[in-house]
Amino acid sequence: MNKKQLKIVTGVAIAVLIVSIIPMLWISQYLHPFADDYVFGAEVYKIWNETHSFPACVQTAWNVAMTMYHTWQGTYSACFLMALQPGVFGQYWLGTFILISSLVTSTYTLLYMVMRKLLHSSRLEYLFVSTLFVLMTIQFTWSYYDAFYWYNGAMYYTLFYSMSLFLASLLIGYQLSSSKFKKALIRGASIVLS
């Protein structure tokens, strides 16, 4: 495939990706909290309605996560994010945006590190392959509801999968970096993502 053809098919692939995501985001306006969304978000919802203080909500989410850690399960980082789900602020639709955005950006980021930094592919080759990969990942999702529309369920899968892709990108960046300062920053970000 020559450069002109690659440019055309890359543009078409990006357009198809955007067109396929728009209805998914549009549908999200009709979502509402469900099942575990209420369990994990109840305390934060109460605090938000009483104080409208985001720092107080973060503290409450931390308390929910610690309670879950000590009494039920050790997935404290997920429990923290589930307690802060957008539905407690009346913006449940934001969950779909967060989940799709994290999946798209993390996939593009990892493939950038692999294709551009390790394999030295051209920008167009990277964009084409990355776009196809993201398109297939989204289109062949087994359950859209569990992956993008049910915030608490998708936290464990879509968001943490995306975070693992970001972590892999950071680890590649760490190996490629010769700067001690950059390595220290990457180390810190890797600890947060781990």
Please name every model-derived segment.
Residues I27-E50, F54-T60, Y69-L81:
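Extracytoplasmic catalytic/substrate-binding loops of multi-pass membrane glycan-assembly enzymes
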